[in-house]
Amino acid sequence: MTTSQLQTEQHQVSDDTAISIQNVTISYGSYEAVKNVYCDVPRGKVTAFIGPSGCGKSTVLRALNRMNDLIEGCSLKGRVLFDGVDLYGASVDPVEVRRRIGMVFQQPNPFPKSIYENIAFGARINGFTGDMDELVERSLRQAAVWDECKDKLNESGYSLSGGQQQRLCIARTIAIQPEVILMDEPCSALDPISTLKIEETMHELKKSFTIVIVTHNMQQAVRVSDMTAFYNAEAVEGGSGKVGYLVEFNETEKIFNSPQQQATQDYVSGRFG
């Protein structure tokens, strides 16, 4: 997204909103995966997407930085506005979208490079010309993995434990200074101690970044998020399969303690899911 695009393609959204999801329906071929989603992701907060498997929460998350573009046959109707710009506008470069809206995946996926180069490589190809040593240290500190890495920066990223690798991936993401970080079940493959460190890291990161996390762990959503969106799925009328939809979006405390919808109450109380 260039400066001229920001000037000519802006739509009106609140200054408090980082990403505005407006009547979004996402399909794989003729199959609707999730439909009619409206949701404003607040700036400088942690927003959690929760819901049972197959409800479309990860599909919506991937739509926020156009990762679904990489899936053959996937299409989107509606608008996803980032700082007022429609991310699916014809002149918007998806590579630039993914630079400004980074993603941390479910499985740690460090580059087959040294710990140092895992951070430096992305910054370098994105045009960083400052003090690389300082950037590497700052990024690793922000991701709370500097102490484990500082004495072995030239060793492979694969030499780290699973939890350390995931924090390395977070450091790699923040090194190119995105404005939003998406996390797709970042702790699902980690042990409880590593999970706690990731959660503590998220609390620090939201001081500088907007974060959206998909999680199946409702206790994690309570611990880390300010806002929660509950997704569910319903049977397709006259057909097979299910389509996901957003049931309720509110402050996390309200979603878990005084939800407005019965389906939300049933899910957060463990009656289904």
UniProtKB/Swiss-Prot annotation:
- CDD domains in alphabetical order: ABC_PstB_phosphate_transporter
Top-level class of the enzyme under EC nomenclature: translocase
InterPro entries the UniProt entry points to: AAA+_ATPase, ABC_transporter-like_ATP-bd, ABC_transporter-like_CS, P-loop_NTPase, PstB-like
Q: Main role?
A: Part of the ABC transporter complex PstSACB involved in phosphate import. Responsible for energy coupling to the transport system.
PANTHER family, per database record:
ABC TRANSPORTER I FAMILY MEMBER 17
Kindly state the subunit structure of this protein: The complex is composed of two ATP-binding proteins (PstB), two transmembrane proteins (PstC and PstA) and a solute-binding protein (PstS).
Record-stated family: Belongs to the ABC transporter superfamily. Phosphate importer (TC 3.A.1.7) family.
> What's this protein's name?
Phosphate import ATP-binding protein PstB
Native source species: Parasynechococcus marenigrum (strain WH8102)
Lineage, broadest ranks: Bacteria, Bacillati, Cyanobacteriota, Cyanophyceae, Synechococcales
